[in-house]
UniProtKB/Swiss-Prot annotation:
Record's protein name: Putative 8-amino-7-oxononanoate synthase
NCBIfam families, alphabetized: bioF
Enzyme Commission designation: 2.3.1.47
Pathway(s) the chain acts in: Cofactor biosynthesis; biotin biosynthesis
Amino acid sequence: MQNNPYSWIESSLSTIHKANWYRSVKTIESIPGAIIKLEGKKLINFASNDYLGLAGDERLIAAAIQATKEFGSGSTGSRLLTGHREIHQELEREIAKLKQTESALVFSSGYLANIGVISSVVSQRDLILSDEYNHSSLKNGAILSGAKIIEYSHNNIEYLKNKLEQKRENYRRSLIITDSVFSMDGDLCKLPLLLDLAEKYNSMLLVDEAHATGVFGINGGGCVEHFNCTGKQLIQIGTLSKALGSLGGYVAGSKNLIEFLRNRTPTWIYTTGLTPADTAAALTAIKIIKKEPERRMKLWQNLEIFINLLETESQLLHKGKKTSNYESPIICFPLKNAVEALKVGEKLKQEGIFAPAIRPPTVNTSRIRISLMSTHETSHLQQLIAALINLSQ
């Protein structure tokens, strides 16, 4: 028997290092935006989820300061005890309006929303069908639920249909779970087809709108709005920490669903309520995206400019460096392995670009992931293209 029960940690760390999977934090020394300061150097930021550039917006900052002055720095308890403020309820009403649902519920993070909701609506007698590219929080929520999990190959509707045909009748409840925008590839789920299958096989459907909220849809309502599926029966989950520039998560759906979750979801019941500052910032962000659709339009214009610049430089498509589909502001450049990805990320930094390597186990294959923002200027996009060209030669 080993003398030290913690000795395995050193061995595990060594394995992580050998696989080039080791991670460490990088300290950003500036306010969020298209230009950031890292290690004393200004870089163009292509690694942020701040799609609409709201995290550094003075109106969000002012709202957070005012809420802190009025309500304090923390909520001090769970929402069912001392942690509820009127501003929480106001935010939930605005989310429900944005998502065009009967009701909504705010969580302290998107991760907590996913694991809490999934493990509340299904359990050991039930079936979960999950896209293989789903976010970690969706996968861990499925595991926590104790339900039977079937992972279907990415966006493979025929495979999913076959599994529902074979397995659905053996279980009490069925839940299909998917990201609407897949965060590490940038492609979209086939939402209308998933809704058809859910209806046909008496299955619930949960869609994680983390990277779609504020970005997709004529009003910023996400992929549900983008695909004209508003009003359909489904569970919508999202985050306040990406395009909304704050922190927290939400679930939107029917009044009965939200009342049930408020009474049964441990990650909401037993967690301190979202801080007044984060709540106020998110509330302000929703109001801004409704009043300023030009922010969203500028984001999509930047994507169009980037695609045009990219496609005129055919060198980038040589040597197997074929990019992902252009369905969202997330563009991926697949690479051979973690070592190559780390080298490319470092070379980009030397060219004034911050777009670090994405490696296993976060993803199956290594890549550079580019995230566009509405606050990027055309010159920023041109500098990125120039840097990519230099690397491809």
